[in-house]
Regions:
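His/Asp/Glu-enriched, well-ordered alpha-helical/loop segment
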Residues: 39, 229, 344-354, 359-385, ...
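Flexible, active-site-proximal loop/turn residues at the rims of small-molecule/cofactor binding pockets
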Residues: 137, 252, 414, 528, ...
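Short loop segments at secondary-structure junctions
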Residues: 54, 175-176, 526-528, 549
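P-loop/Walker A phosphate-binding loop and immediately adjacent motor/lid segment at beta-alpha junctions
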Residues: 121, 534-554
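Short proline/glycine-enriched turn/loop segments at secondary-structure junctions
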Residues: 292-293, 532-536
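Gram-negative bacterial Sec-dependent N-terminal signal peptides
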Residues: 2-20
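Acidic (Asp/Glu)-rich catalytic clusters
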Residues: 263-265, 290-299, 380, 401-403
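Divalent metal-binding segments
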Residues: 25-29, 34-36, 40-287, 302, ...
């Protein structure tokens, strides 16, 4: 283990213990409080009383507060804004934790710049067997071209290098990594995957979707202890953004074991709602174990994650017609219909919610068709099945979400990140059904919002800002990108609270600060309902509380 990693371990361990407090009763007074109620109305309060891990009472301005002598802990909010804790309905906790411990390529503007970061990281961590990283995005580079192994070979030739694209649907390898994996020009593309090649048919070093396994299967798997540390690193970081709960998409058996071992030392710092990975080799065994819920409701397992296609940026999203910028190419369906139905049917028959990744219009149609067939077959209409991303839809499929009782689990910052290339990929007509939040809501669908971290920043205020403005943090473009799809402030807030909770079967516990619900709340540095919408992304969580316990802040 590297010196840098040991330092990170010590720092994270210290962070996890600092600023945590609990009390049997807590009165937080002098706050500018906001929560939604059961009628989805935004209500105000000036003080909140917590008993154990639950909200006991909200107090409006002028209400008599309880005798402070009867309260174990009294805190004065100094008039700052206190709101319901925010929920990210789609992220990847282990990947996020690992990304904090690997070379970070987010923000690079050239292939050479990315390679330089790899060189510096490898030099600082000389004892590593593999150099791993993530975050590159060729769409944002000057060349707008996929990278090649050559640039990595020039900076690290003596160790294998593997770098995941920002969306996790492509990877970039150096020549040694390909040699270890036995990749040659004769290596065939696997089903649902693509090896990018040069004009002579030689692999360039980029592997898309199912082809990534050709390299990744040669990387030594993380041990349970390494996974536990990465999970704790991630959860502690997520708490600093004001996230009190996340839905962890595509979790394998070893990571489930790591979560459960962490519970032996007490509740997790934030809530995690696990989606089991359908491709896990022990998938049927995990389903046979049934649902899981710890005593403190910090770990819940009642859903599965399936991937139907790839991502738009790497042209892996499955489209009905050709990509507008690549004639003859329609993306990748990752599983046969028979295999996908096997995954879905097994989960539905076991009483699990099915959450299927679908980005392209062909993938979304396939998933909705499959849900329509299998929901009727299994009688699982009450399981609130979801489509993760639901990014590009035919108009006729938009109405099917509400009709089938299917939840679109969407990530607002995907729209503001993809706006630079989405029209190039799919053209002016299909874009009308892309990132179509307003059309879906008007058709009766409920949207669970999230970020897809580490693909995007986990900062939920970035997501709230994007939902309301359809702009990036530079407030570009003026007026918003396809602004007719914007959410209202209350709708956006609900998508990160009530509706995200509903999408995980936790609306009776989470999503608002109504009496009887869990005491998950955050104290903010500004009033997100009073400042200009263009400034919402700047908001910061000063404190984060889960189960009435402070997990972030002083």
């Amino acid at each position: 283990m590297t010196t840098r990693l040991w330092a990170a371990i010590l720092a994270a361990s210290a962070f996890a213990c600092v600023g945590v407090s609990s009390a049997d009763t807590l009165l937080y007074k002098n706050v500018n409080g906001y929560t939604l109620n059961g009628d989805r109305e935004l209500i105000r309060f000036s003080a909140i009383k917590i008993e154990d891990d639950r909200v006991a009472q909200l107090y409006s301005e002028g209400d008599s507060l309880p005798d402070e002598a009867s309260i174990d802990s009294v805190r004065d909010g100094g008039g700052k804004t206190l709101t319901t804790g925010l929920i990210d309905a789609h992220g990847h906790v282990l990947s996020y934790g690992q990304s904090l411990l690997r070379v970070d390529l987010v923000g690079t503007t050239t292939e050479a710049g990315a390679a330089e970061r790899v060189r510096a990281f490898a030099a600082d961590n000389a004892e590593l067997e593999w150099v791993l990283g993530r975050g590159w995005n060729q769409v944002l580079w000057d060349s707008n071209e996929f990278p090649t192994a050559r640039s990595l070979d020039a900076v690290v030739a003596d160790k294998p290098v593997w770098l995941s694209r920002v969306d996790g649907h492509a990877g970039w390898a150096n020549s040694l990594a390909m040699e270890i994996a036995g990749i040659t020009r004769d290596t065939a593309d696997p089903d649902g995957g693509q090896i990018l090649r040069d004009a002579n048919g030689n692999p360039t070093g980029v592997f898309v979707d199912n082809a990534m396994a050709l390299i990744r299967n040669n990387i030594p798997p993380a041990t349970i202890e390494e996974q536990k540390f990465a999970l704790m690193t991630a959860m502690n970081s997520l708490a600093t953004y004001g996230l009190t709960s996340v839905h962890d998409a595509g979790v394998g058996s070893s990571t489930v074991a790591a979560y459960k071992e962490l519970l032996e030392d007490g509740p997790l710092p934030i809530r995690v709602n696990v989606m089991l990975a359908a491709t896990d080799q022990f998938y049927t065994e995990r389903l046979a174990e049934g649902h899981f819920r710890d005593a403190d409701d910090t770990l819940t397992i009642n859903s599965v994650k399936i991937a139907a296609d790839g991502a738009l940026g790497s042209r892996g999203a499955a489209m009905i017609d050709d990509y507008s910028d690549m004639a003859g190419h329609r993306g990748l369906i990752l599983h046969s219909e028979e295999r996908m139905h096997y995954f879905m049917r097994a989960a539905m028959n076991a009483g699990f919610q099915v959450n299927t990744h679908a980005i392209g219009d062909a993938a979304n149609k396939l998933v909705l068709d499959s849900y329509e067939l299998l929901i009727a077959e299994t009688g699982s209409s009450d399981r609130r099945h979801r489509v993760e991303h639901a990014q590009i839809l035919r108009y006729e499929d938009i109405v099917r979400f509400a009709e089938l009782g299917v939840i679109p689990s969407m990530q607002a910052t995907h729209a503001t990140s993809d706006k630079n290339m989405a029209v190039d990929r799919i053209g002016d007509v299909r874009i009308q059904g892309a990132y179509a939040w307003r059309k879906l809501m008007d058709a009766g669908a409920l949207i669970a919002n999230g970020s897809d971290f580490p693909v995007e920043s986990p900062n939920p205020f970035f997501g709230l800002h994007a939902s309301i403005t359809r702009q990036d943090k530079d407030n570009d473009p003026v007026g918003g990108w396809y602004p007719e799809e914007r959410m209202t402030d209350e709708e956006a807030f609900a998508s990160f609270t009530l509706d995200a909770a509903y999408s995980g079967f936790q609306e009776d516990l989470l999503g608002s600060l109504e009496p009887g619900k869990k005491a998950d709340f955050i104290l903010l540095d500004r009033d997100i309902f009073a400042i200009p919408d263009t400034e919402i992304w700047q908001a910061k969580a000063l404190e984060t509380w889960v189960n009435g316990v402070r997990v972030h802040g002083d």
